[in-house]
Amino acid sequence: MEKPNWIFLGNTFPELNKIHMHSKTAQLGHGVGPKKSYYSKSDSSTTVRFVESDYRFNRLCEMYPEDNFQNVGFCKMDPIINGEENGIDFTKLGFDNNKKTILYAPTFYPSSIERFSKNFPADLENYNIIIKPHFFSMSKQKYLKQRELLHHWESFNNTYLAKVNDYSLLPYLKSADLMISDASSAIIEFAALNKPVIWCTFLQLRWNYRGIFSYRFKARMDKDYDDYGQIARPANSYNEMIKQAKNLLDSNFTQSNQANEYLKKLAGTLDGNASKRIVTFLLENC
């Protein structure tokens, strides 16, 4: 049986030595979020890991000096930057094309979903709302309460709930005018398109992450977490989030120079050629 030259991994893998007897391995993360796991994915050494920015490249080289890292840029955004991603057909969703569109893209935990009002779509009735939850929110039994709330919001005329098999966030990033999210890679991705983002800091935490146990939440996050406030508008409550959403959509938004500096720090080069650089490296190192 023919063996592949390269195998891609998205996380740590305990038996790389067996793979390396036959093939080379490349690691490529699915996002650039603030969790410490972004860096600890390199605890198992792949042949190469592709990273997005000078900052991340330098940190990883310092943490894992024996490993091979290649700074190629943020390839996930290439289809939008190159004009290959067409976005969403609002007509098929039953949306009013004259209204601006809000993308709510929460993560599964810790999440803002349970902290939102049951009347969330009504509070923003003058806008189209697309809800793109994390796959776990839509599939795991432990997040049933989240699903119940999501399906309730889906019943509003101005709201579309993405299906489980709508796995790609890119069409929604392309088409929306404003994004509301928790601390996730999506914040950086949307802001990189020079669009406004609201970062929900009011989260539903399990009891063992609250009060004297709050250190557990902080332990999940990397120091990059603090940079999100420079890229997105933090909202500390639901009512503050609603007010900010209306204000941002009614204004002529332009990303600040400071925000652009932080975006470059975390997401690196966004020239549409990151994927080509990856392919070139693979072909030259077969």
Annotate each PLM feature.
Residues M1, S42, D123, P171-Y172:
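Structural alpha-helical scaffold elements that stabilize or flank donor/cofactor-binding regions
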Residues M1-E84:
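Active-site and donor-binding regions of nucleotide-sugar-utilizing enzymes
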Residues I7-L9, L16-G29, D166-F213:
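A donor-sugar binding/catalytic signature common to diverse glycosyltransferases
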Residues T46, N71, S185-L266:
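Catalytic binding pocket for nucleotide-activated donors in carbohydrate/polymer assembly enzymes
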Residues V72, K76-H152, A162, A235, ...:
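Conserved catalytic-core segment of nucleotide-activated headgroup transferases in glycan assembly
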Residues N158-N165:
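Active-site donor-binding acidic/aromatic loop of nucleotide-activated sugar
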Residues L270-C286:
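C-terminal alpha-helical cap of glycosyltransferases
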